[in-house]
Structures are given as C-alpha cells and as structure tokens.
Amino acid sequence: MFCFQCQEAAKNEGCTIKGVCGKDDVVANLQDLLIYTIKGLCYVCDKGNYLDDEVMDYIPKALFVTITNVNFDDKDVINWIKKGVALREKIIEKNNLNKEELPYCATWAYETDEDLINLANTKEVSVLAEDNEDIRSLKELITYGIKGIGAYLSHAMHLGYNNEDIHKFIIKAFTKIVDSKDADELFNLAMETGKYAVETLALLDKANTETYGHPEITEVNLGVRDRPGILISGHDLKDLEQLLEQSKDAGVDIYTHCEMLPAHYYPFFKKYEHFVGNYGGSWPFQREEFEKFNGPIVMTTNCLVPPKDSYKDRVYVTNEVGYPGLKRIPVKEDGTKDFSEVIEHAKKCKPPTPLENGKIVGGFAHNQVLALADKVIEAVKSGKIRKFVVMAGCDGRHKTREYYTEFAKKLPKDTVILTCGCAKYRFIKLDLGDIDGIPRVLDAGQCNDSYSLVKIALALKDAFGLNDVNELPIAYNISWYEQKAVTVLLALLYLGVKNIVLGPTLPAFLSPNVTKVLVEKFGISTISTVDEDIKRLVG
C-alpha cells in the first residue's frame, strides 16, 4: 500500500504498511482500485457524452467511500468496485464504445474477488502509477479535492438537491487526469476544481438552509440527563431528522457528537424536546467518549475510528460508512431509514456518563452574522475589533494540534475567531469573552460551512468598499486533516484568498515544486510557533 491523502500520513511521507487511520493494506489498495474504477467510469461517460441518474447516484457516494475514516470494510469496498464496473460496462455497450480505443482503467475485467484484491495490489492502480512526482502531486491534489466535492454533493443529494454541472465537471476532470501529463493544464484543472468546490458548497448550504432554516445563535448543553441516549456522529442532517422523528416518543434522548453539533443551530431541530445536547468533543477522542456514553452510536459519515471491543456492539453505521462487524441501519424501499433497532437498543442501556457541564454558543453562519453586520462593522471601524482570524478545518490526533488551543488563548483581546469544522473543539469551550456583546469565537457550523465564512468575508469586503478580499482585516490559520479540507482549500484559492497558514503540516502529497508554486502564487505557508504566528498574522 501507499497512501498519503491525510494529514497524518506516516512521517509526513505516506503510509506503507498500515494506515495511521487504522485501515489495513488490503482496504487501502482496494480503495485505490475503487478510484481507478471511478476514473474508468468517468472516461467512458466522457467519451459517450453520457450522464444519467444511476451515474449521478454512484460516483459521489463511491468517492465518499475513499475519504479518510469512512470505510474500513474490504467486502464493502469490493461491492462498490463491482457496482462501478457493471455501470461502466453498461455505458460502453449502450454507446457502442470501442474498447481498443479506451485506456486500461476503462476496460479491465475480473472473475473473482481474489482477482480484485490482486489487481488492487499492483502499481498500475496505485497513487505511485504516475512516476513524475510533480504530475502525481497535481493529480492527487485534484483527486482529493474531487473526493470532498463528492462527499458534499452526496449530502446535498440526500436532501433532494443536485447540480448536473458538478457531475459533468467530475467526469471531465477524471478524464483529464487519465490523459494529461501537462503540469500547466493540471494546475489549471486544480483551480477549476476550486470553482466547482465553491458551487458544491453553495448547493449544500442551500439544501441545508432551505430544508432546516438558517442557523441562529444557540446555546448548546454539554451535560447529560438521566435517561438512556443515542449519540449521532458524522455530518448527515437528514439522518438526524429521521432519527429524531422516529424516537420522539421512545423515552430516549438524542445527543450530537463532533460535526453533528451544528445541527442544534438549525431552527427545524429545536422542536424536538428529546434533542438535548452535545456529548464529547472531536473525533480523535471518540474511543474514550463512546465507551462512556453507554448507549448506541450512529455513524452517518466520517470520522470513524476503529472501535474498541467494549462498545463495538453499540455502533451502527449508515451511508458510505463501513467497518467489519458493525450493524448497518436498514433502508426501506422508499429510501427512508429504519432506526427502530437502535432505539430499542438504547432503551436497554444506562444513561450517558457525564463528561462535562455547561454550554457553548454557536450558530454564526452567514445569515446570522450578516444580520449583525452593522454592529460588526462599527466594532471594526471604532477599532474595538482589530482582526478576524479564521481558525477553521479539522482536528486530528497529533500532539502538535495543541498549538491551536494555545494560539486561541494568546490572541489579543481585540481579535475575533471565525470557525467551522471540528477544529473548533480545540478552543470553543475556552472562555475567551466578547467584544461589545460579539463573542470572540463565532462558530459557523460544520466543515462545509466554510462557505459561510466566505460569504461573510465577501459581504464585509463590499461593506467596507474594498476591491480585494485580501484587503480585509482577516487572517487565515487553518488546520486540515482529510480530503474535504483540500476541497475547502481549493475553494479559497479559487476565490483569490492569499496568505493562508495551513497546518499543522503541509500535505505530504504536495511535491516541493508544486508547494513552491502555491507559495509563490498564493502565499501559502505552515505554522511555526504560537508567538511568531500571532506576530505575523495579527501584528
């Protein structure tokens, strides 16, 4: 195996024996084969000028399977590969494509599962198939950006929202990745990936807000009640809606975990009296927190950490999430999910063990912040707010991420943190006070709500009469972990945001030459020390 798609790649070079995430070499290689399968499928769709509902349903979900901490189940990944090959063959036949004119990724065949495992173990389908380090780096940058697009698109489609142009871009992009060896063409494609990342984030924002209302300032309880509970983690709001509706008279409470916390900010969910609070923190600490929760846990998406045996029988998965031995939520013929087993399981469990008390405040997405625009603008003009610091993105296991807690603590009192994603857990529970009633930590929501931060920045640019978003008193100190963060980064670069500090390390998949170009064009850098970074970002 060779995998360097996440921030925790071994030695910041790549995992070669087992993933730091927990996936073994078989699953890692099969995920490479799944991406190879998607490339072949996209290639035949492009050559046949073909797109239908089945393709649009399959590709985003299959991409989601390969994101870090989503699927660890070799049998599940094999099934996704088989679906892709069957769909590819159907399109070849339907469009009378000549296989002799197609690349191997669009023509390979298999007879047994063992054939798939053997093919997955070859260089041909791996990241290392591209020998040129810079071309490989650009292709992987685009691929990881598209993986995130696929994930966000899946969420939007789950709510009934879609955009065919995004699907057409994915097909075109993977076709170019197969064909192109031109660094300039691939760099431009990476920037175009940023464009479609923005469109996808906008689509998901529309899906979430039109379905559940605009997030509003909300206090979220961190304590527990004395009833059994169900803990829901991941990102999928539709799953939460179904779980809440099915459990409302069951005598159990529903708690969010990690990236599901922002669900409390949406008006729609406030009607459920048994939707009581958030339990725990970010995903790296789930093994201890899940054990203490005592009740069942529903994983709707990433991030799943390989579970301990002590609570493995309480973990349920749905959507693209997979791990050997975990129970899967049944899906009915009409597409809705049946959470009855989870609910009955919860009734037999003890209430959650308390982890902490108190409350946190969030809900500062674009609509809410722009409603406070006059107050914010006045605070900036009067000098009470000197700078906004975007501290968005992902959390992770590395001890180096303690940097973000210290950075938040040491920021001058006239600065305001704009955040979203699970990176927030490094500082959202700190008492950092407020500026004239404006909290010094404004949480916009999930990682995809980085779109809110962009909308806020663009609105402030217009309000201050500036020509360039980089003229705003906003600094960017972003932490990344998995591929959706790459999608967000490309979106920011496409929008022209410069001087982003990306940490705690730069991606292992960026070659020295590609890194140099990103530094020269966009001023990207990584973290140093807290004091030095506050000096350069805030002054």
Swiss-Prot record:
Protein's cellular compartments: Cytoplasm
InterPro entries xref list: HCP/CODH, Hydroxylam_reduct, Prismane-like_a/b-sand, Prismane-like_sf, Prismane_a-bundle
Gene Ontology BP annotations: nitric oxide catabolic process; response to hydrogen peroxide
Keyword vocabulary terms for this entry: 4Fe-4S, Cytoplasm, Iron, Iron-sulfur, Metal-binding, Oxidoreductase
Keyword Cytoplasm set for record: yes
Reaction it catalyzes: A + NH4(+) + H2O = hydroxylamine + AH2 + H(+)
Protein name: Hydroxylamine reductase
Organism field: Methanocaldococcus jannaschii (strain ATCC 43067 / DSM 2661 / JAL-1 / JCM 10045 / NBRC 100440) (Methanococcus jannaschii)
Gene, per the UniProt record: hcp
